Amino acid sequence: MRVLFAGTPDVAIPTLRALVGSRHHVVAALTRPPARRSRRGHDEPSPVAATAAELGVPVLEPRSVRATDVAEELRALDLDVAVVVAYGALLPEDLLAIPRHGWINLHFSVLPAWRGAAPVQHAVWHGDEVTGATTFRITAGLDEGPVYGVLTERVRPRDTSGDLLARLADAGPRLVLDTLDAVADGTARPQAQPDDGVTLAPRLSVEQARVRWADPALAVDRQVRACTPAPGAWTTLDGARVKVGPLDPVDAPPLPAGRIAVERQRVLVGTGSAPVELGRLAPAGKGWMDAASWARGARLAGDATFGADDG
């Protein structure tokens, strides 16, 4: 089949590579336009754009998919199907009607759970033991379309959202290829999503990533792992922002929420229940460092407390 691939970040690359190596023909890659993606200060192509160019796939980088020339370009491609992996923009209905077999999305949850932009982060934050990925046909509703296939993946106890997303991104291409092969062969039987079990996963804001030290240790641990690497867990110390890496709940005497205690080369922080051990952090304007090294040079007051000025 003639396939349009739509995606933008690194997690979309395994599927793009798999499609290019498959029986199907990737005629173009639709991706978000160049943007500032690092501290270099200039716009850079998306990871998908760079990979598509490497693979010899023509790249489409419209500022808006609602522009009339985008629909014209897609019609000219004579598309059988479009595959979406984290494109990063909502598709208007006139575009959805262009490919003969519609647009098939690889979504990183087992639908109807965690519909929305941040399914992996929400799965980690809510302590899900199992999640997965789903291929479904995109419709006008938010991740509501009929399902072609599902895979499942265990959420490991120390997974960050980045860890889990990387595994799903590597497992997803097989599901996508199986789905496309079934569509091409006429054996695909998409099933409507059930009405029960629907949960929503909106994008996490920077404010939601502010560590809530007054919550129980388990909740704090899940919050930080869910926000790692994005949007990035953080707190404050003496009015300055500090990035916080994954934590480890420990068996230690309780501390006031946010209180910092240095003990035997460990940096402990109080929560609403038991303390947690801080492994890494990044003080304002500095790179990541291990917490023990930071504590040795930080000249902490005896009552130093993360988040004391949160209000």
Curated annotation (Swiss-Prot):
**What SUPFAM superfamilies does its record include?**
FMT C-terminal domain-like, Formyltransferase
Listed GO MF terms = methionyl-tRNA formyltransferase activity
Question: Which Pfam families does the UniProt record give?
Answer: Formyl_trans_C, Formyl_trans_N
Give yes or no: UniProt keyword Flavoprotein.
no
As for what it does, the entry says:
Attaches a formyl group to the free amino group of methionyl-tRNA(fMet). The formyl group appears to play a dual role in the initiator identity of N-formylmethionyl-tRNA by promoting its recognition by IF2 and preventing the misappropriation of this tRNA by the elongation apparatus.
Family to which the UniProt record says this protein belongs: Belongs to the Fmt family.
Can you say what this protein is called? Methionyl-tRNA formyltransferase
- From which organism does this entry originate? Beutenbergia cavernae (strain ATCC BAA-8 / DSM 12333 / CCUG 43141 / JCM 11478 / NBRC 16432 / NCIMB 13614 / HKI 0122)
